[in-house]
From Swiss-Prot:
Name under which the protein is recorded: Large ribosomal subunit protein mL41
Cellular component, GO annotation: mitochondrial large ribosomal subunit; ribonucleoprotein complex
Keyword annotations: Mitochondrion, Ribonucleoprotein, Ribosomal protein, Transit peptide
Oligomeric and partner information: Component of the mitochondrial ribosome large subunit (39S) which comprises a 16S rRNA and about 50 distinct proteins.
Compartment list: Mitochondrion
Keyword Mitochondrion set for record: yes
Source species of the chain: Drosophila pseudoobscura pseudoobscura (Fruit fly)
Family: Belongs to the mitochondrion-specific ribosomal protein mL41 family.
Gene expressing this chain: mRpL41
Single biological process term from Gene Ontology: translation
Length: 166
């Protein structure tokens, strides 16, 4: 028991070293954590910001641009630097400012090769049949530019920049 009493004063007198394991941004006095623009600093620094032409710590204007310049300590307004807000007339505009997120349910079948054929070629085939401009084997007497293409030419044309694929 007496040994413990003798060790306590020695332990209290020894300097202790400590290593901080917390991150720098989590410290108590870390001002980078909170954006407090134009609020920090002493009265002397704030007075220098107001009076000096080019203070060492400029006043943060938060993105607002000046509409003039300082000439001999006086602020001169420049009309060209004042922004004009041009609002267009939207009375006949078909677009509305709010679009509902509740879009109508659209059910569409899978687009097949038959659908593609009907969309592109069926109208011309029916017109050629009614006009009687088909040959005995079913090929047209006067083929269009798309019908004259070979399979390799059509393949290259479909892969070209500006086609419907891209």
């Amino acid at each position: 028991m007496q040994n413990c009493i003798k060790l306590v004063p020695l332990a209290l007198k020894c300097p202790q070293r400590a290593i901080s394991t917390s991150a720098v941004l989590d410290g108590k006095r870390n001002f980078r954590k909170f954006n407090v623009h134009s609020k920090r600093g002493t009265r002397v620094v704030k007075e220098a910001q107001k009076t000096m032409a080019n203070p060492p710590v400029p006043i943060d204007k938060r993105g607002v641009r000046d509409t003039g310049i300082l000439v001999d300590g006086k602020f001169v307004e420049i009309p060209e630097k004042i922004p004009d807000i041009i609002v267009p007339d939207l009375t006949d505009c078909k677009l509305k400012p709010y679009v509902s997120y509740k879009a109508p349910e659209v059910v569409q079948s899978e687009f097949t090769s038959l659908d593609l054929f009907n969309a592109v070629y069926s109208k011309k085939i029916v017109e050629d049949f009614k006009a009687g401009s088909l040959q005995a084997d079913g090929s047209p007497k006067e083929p269009s530019a798309e019908e004259k293409l070979t399979s390799s030419e059509a393949f290259l044309r479909a892969r070209r920049t500006g086609s419907d694929i891209f």
